[in-house]
Amino acid sequence: MSQRGLEALLRPKSIAVIGASMKPNRAGYLMMRNLLAGGFNGPVLPVTPAWKAVLGVLAWPDIASLPFTPDLAVLCTNASRNLALLEELGEKGCKTCIILSAPASQHEDLRACALRHNMRLLGPNSLGLLAPWQGLNASFSPVPIKRGKLAFISQSAAVSNTILDWAQQRKMGFSYFIALGDSLDIDVDELLDYLARDSKTSAILLYLEQLSDARRFVSAARSASRNKPILVIKSGRSPAAQRLLNTTAGMDPAWDAAIQRAGLLRVQDTHELFSAVETLSHMRPLRGDRLMIISNGAAPAALALDALWSRNGKLATLSEETCQKLRDALPEHVAISNPLDLRDDASSEHYIKTLDILLHSQDFDALMVIHSPSAAAPATESAQVLIEAVKHHPRSKYVSLLTNWCGEHSSQEARRLFSEAGLPTYRTPEGTITAFMHMVEYRRNQKQLRETPALPSNLTSNTAEAHLLLQQAIAEGATSLDTHEVQPILQAYGMNTLPTWIASDSTEAVHIAEQIGYPVALKLRSPDIPHKSEVQGVMLYLRTANEVQQAANAIFDRVKMAWPQARVHGLLVQSMANRAGAQELRVVVEHDPVFGPLIMLGEGGVEWRPEDQAVVALPPLNMNLARYLVIQGIKSKKIRARSALRPLDVAGLSQLLVQVSNLIVDCPEIQRLDIHPLLASGSEFTALDVTLDISPFEGDNESRLAVRPYPHQLEEWVELKNGERCLFRPILPEDEPQLQQFISRVTKEDLYYRYFSEINEFTHEDLANMTQIDYDREMAFVAVRRIDQTEEILGVTRAISDPDNIDAEFAVLVRSDLKGLGLGRRLMEKLITYTRDHGLQRLNGITMPNNRGMVALARKLGFNVDIQLEEGIVGLTLNLAQREES
């Protein structure tokens, strides 16, 4: 997430082209031509011993002879010279370099050289970059592109060229167009951080094939998507496609889970990609999800309606007032409804009257206008009239407008006019709906991610007990645990398992069955046979001693015949669970090579195909995220919403998924968990059969997770001056109600000191941003008083670090009636310790000169206090390294 050197890459003041040439079709010629044609307003320095000048620009024979150090260099020479040239650039002090091509054998040496000289690299095997707002075309693309608000980041040169060509035809603009290549150094997460703060960028589109660091990507994407829509197209869904791309991209459902968790939206194919570019370039942000459709034909409107229903879209309902205005304005044969079919004899005037009435209403959030080729309303004329009407209508800025001029030849000019006018336009009704639903789904994702999670009830965990059991099993050489062995581990996290006994032979199995009562189930115990069904290793509803003995002997006999080398550790004996009206589910935890542990929910079966049969989420889960997973499973028909007799307890299943998540987060020894079946009966969830694969683990537990979990280790009990003990802990998403209550106990004066303005009310979005934080990027500690089972927030302090993890902005707020207890100082001391241990160098903040308490506290804590009376602020800076030394 480092931003070091990105300014020199994306906003360079000078550029050197190493290997510039006058020979057409050479890389050095193409790069020089594009840089000069793009209108870059800084010096361009061609470096070549072969020419005195290149395209009229004085050339320099080598890097050492350059009159000054360029911000950016582009290597256009033979790849064999890359390392030597990069070394020279580093010694010259160049900050960034684009490497157009390099074999894999050079990668490590190039990375080491760049690191040694504190230089940033784009590529290798990069098409380059375009930054139209800077007049920069440092790429092979001969296509000039307009200035726009959409940034595009691609890991494929071929896709980049395709999009550039497509965008040129539609006169579509970009803020940045960056081809990453092999991402030897600069990667997508760093660019997301940069573009999130770029004023010229309002939306971001990504084409991805692989990730080098899933944790950094999810963190950066989540941060950026809170302010700007980000759409992703990810290739390599199948193993065959991954082999073709030479990537280890991981499970495709894991990508879906990560993209959704970060608040992004995934587009599925190239057709959707082009629609997404059109949408992000021209469409206004949605205010809601209600769609109004106008058409001059029933069939195109029906196609649009079918596409809308297939994606769970929402059709607007017109008010009676709007309907009456439409009846008065339109011919009698036009039925007033949504979709509104104006009929094939509709003129341009009918379109304009309808548009004017609808734009004055507030019955919808987006308006889709469909036009089929018609003699009554020629395509180009209708488009021109519509553009003028929208341009001059006072309420047009409040509605997202989408146009679909059907046909090819007759509508080509109309679509060009729409593009020039900045109105999104699409070729088909289905494509228009797809584009609309992209923005609806993005908006829904963001809304869901900001909902306040419910507090789970009776959620227990005994991490120490689970760790002890796992370590004992590992010490004994175990690599896989069965239901009997897993039972106490699951119980430590509050999960129910069916009581299980072990029988070494058929006689012992009969004895156990007699003790626990019939009917019973017998299951094979063998570490070498993962799927018991392969040898009919599960026998159910055994009702007598004779049936148990025969079933046990039959299992042993089948194993000897089919798996003579398999180790057999006896049988598991269980009472038969009451399955009447119950539903069988499956919960699996797998380890993905890119995203780490994944939690999968489905109904399973013998042939378990998670790509087709399960929904997937990244841990850690809270109640909201778990509930979304369950609902997603129901909507996608991966699980049923009810059994034959009763509905599925969504809240109960969500709580169980949270318990599974906590177990996986706390216990890195777990490599795989398979609960199958999980019996759902009313509010009871019972694991009937469980397999747990384990292995020793050393290192940072959190590093294996794509999302940093709640840092329990930072919790601390603190005694205040009045002798009261309170808990200092990181803030949680579930704290939103308590935070709102806390703010209500802070005086307006103290809030003014904190926020530099009068604040009447904090919205849910404000509070969600304060409580739903990324622990990798910021930290907020709350001081809480525990009373029975409730918590009361007494004070808050937070620090938000920059992407380079050098500086952090801090703030602290204490309940106004609790001043004088040392609460503010203790919170600040905890924050200082955390930021110093986290590797930050400086802690910065501002307050007002008349906030004497904060100024005095800062001085006591060692801050440098800079009083700026003219500005009306006091700057506070703490050098964390110096404080540690002192």
UniProtKB/Swiss-Prot annotation:
Keywords: Acetylation, Acyltransferase, Transferase
Domain called ATP-grasp: residue spans: 487-523
KO phenotype (gene knockout): Deletion mutant has decreased resistance to oxidative and heat stress. Mutant responds poorly to glucose.
Subunit: Stable tetramer in solution. Oligomerizes to an octameric form by autoacetylation.
One biological process term in Gene Ontology: response to heat
Ranges for domain N-acetyltransferase: 726-881
Origin: domain of life: Bacteria
Reported function: Catalyzes the acetyl-CoA-dependent acetylation of lysine residues of a large number of target proteins. Acetylates RNase R in exponential phase cells and RNase II. Required for the glucose-dependent acetylation on multiple lysines of alpha, beta and beta' RNAP subunits. Also acetylates acetyl-coenzyme A synthetase (Acs) and the chromosomal replication initiator protein DnaA, and inhibits their activity. Overexpression leads to the acetylation of a large number of additional proteins and inhibits motility.
GO MF terms held by the record: ATP binding; identical protein binding; metal ion binding; protein-lysine-acetyltransferase activity
Gene3D superfamilies the record matches: 3.40.630.30, ATP-grasp fold, A domain (3.30.1490.20), ATP-grasp fold, B domain (3.30.470.20), NAD(P)-binding Rossmann-like Domain (3.40.50.720), Succinyl-CoA synthetase domains (3.40.50.261)
One Pfam short name: ATP-grasp_5
GO cellular component: protein-containing complex
Coiled coil: none
CDD domains, per database record: NAT_SF (cd04301)
Keyword Repeat: no
Protein name in UniProt: Peptidyl-lysine N-acetyltransferase PatZ
Modification(s) after translation: Autoacetylated. Deacetylated by CobB.
Family indicated by similarity: In the N-terminal section; belongs to the acetate CoA ligase alpha subunit family. In the central section; belongs to the acetate CoA ligase beta subunit family.
